[in-house]
Amino acid sequence: MGVDPFKTTETLEADKETNGGVPVKDKLTFKAPERKSRLGLDARAIEKKDNAKTEGEFKVPKKSAISVTSSLDEEDKSDVSGLDFGTENTRPVHSSRRYREKSSRSQSAQESTVTTENAGTSDISITPRTLSCTSSYERGGSNRHREEHRRDRSETPRSRQRNTYDEMDHYRRRESYRQSDRDYHGEKRRRYNSDWRTPGRSDWDDGQDEWERSPHGDRGSSYSRRPQPSPSPMLAAASPDARLASPWLDTPRSTMSSASPWDMGAPSPIPIRASGSSIRSSSSRYGGRSNQLAYSREGDLTNEGHSDEDRSQGAEEFKHEITETMRVEMEYQSDRAWYDTDEGNSLFDADSASFFLGDDASLQKKETELAKRLVRRDGSKMSLAQSKKYSQLNADNAQWEDRQLLRSGAVRGTEVQTEFDSEEERKAILLVHDTKPPFLDGRVVYTKQAEPVMPVKDPTSDMAIISRKGSGLVKEIREKQSANKSRQRFWELAGSNLGNILGIEKSAEQIDADTAVVGDDGEVDFKGEAKFAQHMKKGEAVSEFAMSKTMAEQRQYLPIFSVRDELLQVIRENQVIVVVGETGSGKTTQLTQYLHEDGYTINGIVGCTQPRRVAAMSVAKRVSEEMETELGDKIGYAIRFEDVTGPNTVIKYMTDGVLLRETLKDSDLDKYRVVVMDEAHERSLNTDVLFGILKKVVARRRDFKLIVTSATLNAQKFSNFFGSVPIFNIPGRTFPVNILYSKTPCEDYVEAAVKQAMTIHITSPPGDILIFMTGQDEIEAACFSLKERMEQLVSSSSREITNLLILPIYSQLPADLQAKIFQKPEDGARKCIVATNIAETSLTVDGIYYVIDTGYGKMKVFNPRMGMDALQVFPISRAASDQRAGRAGRTGPGTCYRLYTESAYLNEMLPSPVPEIQRTNLGNVVLLLKSLKIDNLLDFDFMDPPPQENILNSMYQLWVLGALNNVGGLTDLGWKMVEFPLDPPLAKMLLMGERLDCIDEVLTIVSMLSVPSVFFRPKERAEESDAAREKFFVPESDHLTLLNVYQQWKEHDYRGDWCNDHYLQVKGLRKAREVRSQLLDILKQLKIELRSCGPDWDIVRKAICSAYFHNSARLKGVGEYVNCRTGMPCHLHPSSALYGLGYTPDYVVYHELILTTKEYMQCATSVEPHWLAELGPMFFSVKDSDTSMLEHKKKQKEEKSGMEEEMEKLRRDQVESELRSKERERKKRAKQQQQISGPGLKKGTTFLRPKKLGL
């Protein structure tokens, strides 16, 4: 195919000015070959197919200054600030990546004047359409023929047909183009052969000054970027949504296809054209300006020309409204997710769906799309390593072409792109090694933590196998619900994208109603709104007994009332007492009131600890009603990030974690007169640590009393731990329970429980049913199946069927559902309550006659492979089984149906549950105990000591984070970390934010990580919610994505309707705002100033890396990573902002691993390898090119010997300190000895040795 030069050449006026004495004639402007993508492909080959021709010609006015006008592309409406135009030839300077910039300047203020040394007298108006400043290397035009040859080959027939329409317009200029071309090349040869160059100039910058004075208008320096996919193999089939690099909120989707920073050009030899320009003239990084990743309200207001249109288009896109049902579901799930979590952060429930992660169907769809992109034309699959080889081949071809151009004389030199390389970004070789602190004496290997004590008697038993396999009914119902939701979506058009296209909108009345319910005012008392106490309703009587008695009369009918005086007498006579009473006997609500009435609150307060949040709150509410006082006045409660107490509080209910943290500030707990450890039989992690601490408090304070309550018969163990203290038994008000076992093991315990409940409802006398399940998914599946089968039964049965009221019970029970549980059902309906193990002891429900025990429960177990605590299903213990059966005998003779065999009860169940301290991670516990000046943790008085390896490994984790020094003591960083109620890595991240001057941003990220996911993903709006979420993506980091979400919410005045428009959990965001406020108060107490890093979010990524460098992974394959230290494979999750970008970072750190179908990294952030070496020197080091491995080994040996010397010095100091203390004690005793004078004693002697005895 011939070369058609008429498409790109333009007629220019002659300029007879001189430059250095040499005439400067008019030059043609050629369009350079496009820059290569990160994978070495032509990143804009497809984009150029449909580019329209530039209209008009350049006009050369006669003036001396060059005016450079930066007009903004439609793609980016924000202002370009911070541009630095030098007066001399500039080189590409690396600037840090910036994500957000705000500016209030208008477009008219964006013009700047550049005066160039030795400039000609012409004034050239240049209007680049990219967001960049002008570089010295601009696009040249000397290779236009080659470029047009490429364009001709890549043009489609349609674009060629369109191009022919303009041929006549160019016909008149054709001869002038050819003449200009001949004149230009002739002059170029003459000038090149002449000796006009000065010694200060070289071939490298030859023509650069010429270029800056040449007419290279719109065609030479800019292009119109079209929303077309990149041709790289990673993005060949990607949708525009999948490639969002810097999403703009409220921006039409057609303008959101900007390239990812990861998809920019790789360092490769790029030709410098005859004019001295390089391809990357329009790069935004030269001037310090980079892609904005967040929608700026001020920036939008400045672009008045486009703002109205964009707002209208953005409004059209977000016309999908949240229905009332979806809003209720959103608030319900938000409450449930927040109050479900324990006091710890790193807890993953493998069976619970995560809002952030999405459902299985969408994840499989995304993974399938990614797999398709890596299939060759012949059908064979291509790994990422092979994809890189293919990309390198293209890069080599490009270099070959550049060499040919060099030989032909069309270009004068090559420039190696250094746009993404700075001095510190050179290729780093990361060496991995393990350094052990000397205080552990080599007794620990961080990556191979010993297996924790598993709470299962026989892993090969039937119950253990069934618990690992899970329920088939749950999966079946999940798929059925998903199918139903997708069917409904077709005719639920109002508010959907299709509805917007067809013009189907909600009525004004519906919109007003939704807005009234959601609320559009963000400036509310978020602290008060977030408190659970504001939502709890007054408890209503359910049983006939409760409805017929007043609250005072009900108190007198409780079993504990009959032994009130004897109990108080035992408390007066003993400092520690163990109280045993069945659940429902009144010990939790009445014991604290009895102590208050007996005068124990005159000189202090009565504290009562609970293992669960909901128990602490609901019990405090009940006691405040019985004492007829407001909650928060005399009666209060305190849980993590929520304190509802006041100066008049005399009875305080709290979680055991809250009391544990109070021991840090007041080791003797001086403000407490009595502490009641309620539900001690559950043996939570904090409870066991409190036992050891309170045992020392009892020894120091003789006026302090400790009461331990338990619902089971293992009270003798508590009594022995505190020194054989008395045990007081409260007589129970129980009725006989008939226990029925299953004849064969149940393969699907959820389906068996549903069938048993239906059988009871049809055949048994009146009485409510209680079903014990393991978790949220199973409870919802059981409720769905029960409802479905009841509808079938009512429709198919000829006789009247009693209604069945199905109610779930979660540990995070929302306030509205809590009222339903205790309300009496209407029309004589039977209640069927589906509950977790919270109903074993923490909640008492009247009217239960039938209990269905599945025999399973979820327990928190440390998973060393994942490196975190996870909720897993295990068979329950015999003690828990007896406790469940006892729930049927509270109001009358009951029946317990056990869905396992009697043999399994006797042989496959443990006698009592394994304490949590023996099966979980101990990082926080070790930090707390160290702060209490307990040096030797292995000698701490635990009731059930955890495995020694667990303690040592937790100490090693803290040493890695810098909380412990080389000799095992707390560092300054460690002392500060203790003050924050956070996991150690999050506390480290927060304090590193202070050191790096970005604590404002890190504080927001930590707050967002401390609450459940803020993304709401209704199944019937899955695609819309995914699209809305992608607008917030920051391609380098999921952590920065969370920061972006919070900042956008803040910019929109914390509005609730804005959250609904963008599928965000408004309650979750408000909870994050409350947590942020709590942490901010702690920072003020520590006198830490709140500083922000502004738009430079690279510093924030470094702070994140400082906390999670031990969870680092390097790239290996298609979206597959391996842990840098263990080699364990882990994958980017399809919901991650880093997923499917086309270029994935070489190194990432992640918050935690989630084990589902694969090991997925949750909350990943890209990091630089030298950050890992700088922040985690005990694991990583960078191999310098001028050092050998032998030198590295010598250096490691020196560091190790230095730590050993430090440890040896500490031991010597300890020995000397002990000798000095013994000497002081000896002298003190000598002074105290009395000098007694008597018969036979030498005067002044201190020894009673009579002389007459010859002694």
From Swiss-Prot:
Q: What is this protein called?
A: Pre-mRNA-splicing factor ATP-dependent RNA helicase DEAH7
Q: Where in the cell is it found?
A: Nucleus
General function of this protein:
Involved in pre-mRNA splicing by mediating structural transitions of the spliceosome during the catalytic step. Facilitates expression of genes involved in auxin-mediated development including male-gametophyte transmission, apical-basal patterning of embryonic and gynoecium development, stamen development, phyllotactic flower positioning, and vascular development. Also involved in root-meristem maintenance and planar polarity of root-hair positioning. Acts as a component of RNA silencing that regulates distinct classes of endogenous small RNAs.
Motif DEAH box positions after renumbering to this chain: 678-681
Bias class Low complexity marks the residues at: 220-240, 271-290
What is catalyzed by this enzyme?
ATP + H2O = ADP + phosphate + H(+)
Per UniProt, the ranges with Polar residues bias are: 109-137
Q: Where is this motif: Nuclear localization signal?
A: 144-153, 172-191
State the organism of origin: Arabidopsis thaliana
Ranges of biased composition (kind: Basic and acidic residues): 13-60, 144-219, 297-316, 1190-1224
Annotated region (Disordered) at 1-316, 1190-1255
Query: Its GO CC terms?
Result: nucleus; spliceosomal complex
Q: Which residues form the Helicase ATP-binding domain?
A: 568-731
Give the source's domain of life in one word.
Eukaryota
How does gene deletion manifest?
Narrow rosette leaves with altered venation pattern.
The molecular function GO annotations come to: ATP binding; ATP hydrolysis activity; nucleic acid binding; RNA helicase activity
Q: What is the lineage of its organism?
A: Eukaryota, Viridiplantae, Streptophyta, Embryophyta, Tracheophyta
Give the multimer and partner information: Interacts with the Phytophthora PSR1 protein.
Keyword list, A-Z: ATP-binding, Helicase, Hydrolase, Immunity, Innate immunity, mRNA processing, mRNA splicing, Nucleotide-binding, Nucleus, RNA-mediated gene silencing, Spliceosome, Transcription, Transcription regulation
Annotated ATP binding sites: G581, E582, T583, G584, S585, G586, K587, T588
